[in-house]
Design a protein with these regions (language model features):
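Short, Lys/Arg- and Gly-enriched loop/turn segments at beta-strand edges
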Residues: 45-52, 90-97, 230
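Local cysteine-cluster metal-coordination motifs and their immediate loop/turn environment
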Residues: 113, 205-234
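Short microdomains enriched in Cys/His and/or Lys/Arg
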Residues: 234-243
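Structural signal for conserved beta-strand scaffold positions within catalytic alpha/beta enzyme cores
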Residues: 10, 54, 155-157, 202-204, ...
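FNR/FR-type flavoprotein reductase catalytic core
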Residues: 69-207
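Ferredoxin-reductase
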Residues: 2-81
């Protein structure tokens, strides 16, 4: 974990209520896709945990949804705004277990970390397939970003207004993939858990207090005892999850 000051370089709307923010700052503490950052906001007691969408030397990209006063405040930030951010939080995804053809499944706010994961897998010569889930076409974001990487991308919408009608599990194939990586709301993760036929890693979205394991506010039960989503997670192995 590392604390630093970051400067907003861009902040654009991707879809209604969904924004992409690029920041300049020290990203050396970020070591794996699936980690998150914790952002301090003026007038707010708790920091806001946001997953890492992408990072490079001196550059951090986050994609966030406006769900309350804090993220609404973020959506109005102009380039040049300075933010106090904790980076390198959480365990992230383990790429060594993926096999050659992993399947990446993201739903809503769980889509951004799939992008950094896809880039890292491609850099290792692996060929991921991607499923992105939305409620309706108007909410779609980042499909073009994944396609620009040369990936096979399937979009699902609950109302059928774009892509496959239904949920992400309606697009999960019976065979042809070696491993599953997923991130999204708990009901989606449970459905993927039940539908997928391989091992995998599941990233959980939980409300957090401190973001680094001190407050014990995001503890969950696993087959191997209690784990803190912010510290030992947010990524858990499929085999250890208790529903």
């Amino acid at each position: 974990m590392k604390r630093g000051l970051f400067t907003v370089t861009s902040n654009e709307q991707l879809a209604p209520g969904t924004f992409r923010m690029v920041l300049a700052g020290d990203t050396t503490a970020i070591t794996a896709p699936g980690q998150f950052v914790n952002i301090a906001l003026e007038g707010k007691f708790l920091r806001r945990p946001i997953s890492v969408c992408d990072w490079g030397e001196g550059s951090l990209t986050i994609v966030y949804k406006v769900v309350g006063q804090g993220t609404e405040q973020m959506s109005r930030m102009a380039p040049g705004t300075r933010l106090d951010i904790l980076t390198g939080l959480g365990n992230g995804y383990d790429l060594n277990k993926s096999g050659d053809r992993p399947l990446l499944i993201g739903g809503g706010a769980g889509i951004p970390p799939m992008f950094a994961l896809a880039k890292k897998l491609l850099a290792q010569g692996k060929i991921p397939s991607v499923i992105l889930g939305f409620n309706q076409a108007a909410e779609q974001f980042m499909q073009a970003d994944f396609q620009a990487l040369g990936l096979d991308v399937t979009v699902t919408t609950a109302d059928g207004s774009l892509g496959v009608k239904g949920f992400v599990t309606d697009a999960v194939p019976q065979t042809g993939y070696t491993y599953v990586y997923t991130c999204g709301p708990a009901p989606m993760l449970k459905a993927v858990y039940d539908k997928s036929v391989t091992s995998g890693q599941f990233s959980f979205e939980e409300r957090m207090g401190c973001g680094f394991g001190a407050c014990m506010g995001c503890t969950c039960q696993t087959k191997y005892g209690n784990k803190r989503i912010c510290r030992e997670g947010p990524v858990l192995e499929k085999e250890e999850i208790l529903w």
